[in-house]
């Protein structure tokens, strides 16, 4: 009887590990897909080649809801799909060349932004207000990483840092604040549940 119980526990433990690994793969793939879908919600901004998308919201949520490692993995998966030819970038674009253009710096910053948002968000604490403020600051830091990455590449392409900030950061600030507010609400509600899953 004891051997049977030990064998069942061992089998159940293996099953739990397998289920956890499967959940992680599914969550990484789901956030890669959400990032791709959010690229199709693109609003052009006059005077700049970079549209407003919902991608920032999804990227920082990936970090906050999956944690830094899996959040980054979801964004690396997204970028790999685009580099391999899947039409996942804004407007259905694909290919490595897209990462070398005006939007490439933003895209390449996605995995780093997910790590920053996930790492700074940490675990929820007992004080809900403090945890929500911390979450908001973590998501804002992740969004800032994306803007800095985008502006940096624009500065390299244009040779003008001032123009890069004027065209690659300033037009997006109001939209980023709105997206971050939505992201904080979503993350505050789902964070504990998703972190338990992965």
Which stretches of residues belong to each language-model region?
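Alpha-helical transmembrane segments in multi-pass membrane proteins
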Residues: 30-38, 59, 63, 74-82, ...
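Residue-level signature of transmembrane alpha-helical entry/exit and packing/kink sites
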Residues: 20-28, 52-59, 71, 102, ...
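Alpha-helical membrane segments and adjacent membrane-interface helices in multi-pass membrane proteins
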Residues: 42-116
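Peri-membrane helix termini and adjoining interfacial loops of integral membrane proteins
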Residues: 1-8, 83-88, 158-163
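Membrane-embedded alpha-helical hairpins and interfacial helices in multi-pass inner-membrane proteins
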Residues: 48, 123-198
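Hydrophobic transmembrane alpha-helices
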Residues: 2-72
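Short helix-perturbing small/polar motifs within transmembrane alpha-helices
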Residues: 3-17, 37, 96-148
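Structural signal for the C-terminal ends of transmembrane alpha-helices
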Residues: 65-69, 116-124, 189-193
């Amino acid at each position: 009887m004891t051997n049977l119980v030990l064998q069942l526990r061992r089998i159940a433990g293996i099953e739990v590990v397998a289920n956890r690994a499967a959940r992680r793969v599914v969550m990484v793939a789901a956030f890669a897909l959400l990032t791709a879908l959010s690229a199709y919600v693109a609003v052009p901004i006059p005077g700049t080649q970079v549209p407003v998308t919902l991608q920032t919201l999804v990227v920082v949520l990936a970090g906050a809801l999956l944690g830094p490692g899996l959040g980054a993995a979801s964004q690396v998966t997204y970028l790999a799909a685009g580099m391999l030819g899947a039409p996942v970038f804004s407007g259905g674009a694909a290919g490595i060349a897209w990462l070398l253009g005006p939007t490439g710096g933003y895209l390449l910053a996605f995995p780093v932004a997910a790590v920053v948002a996930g790492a700074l968000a940490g675990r929820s604490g007992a004080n809900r207000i403090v945890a929500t403020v911390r979450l908001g600051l973590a998501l804002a830091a992740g969004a800032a990483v994306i803007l800095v990455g985008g502006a940096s590449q624009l500065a390299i392409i244009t040779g003008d840092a001032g123009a890069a900030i004027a065209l690659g950061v300033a037009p997006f600030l109001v939209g980023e604040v709105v997206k971050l507010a939505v992201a904080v609400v979503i993350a505050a509600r789902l964070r504990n549940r998703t972190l338990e899953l992965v």
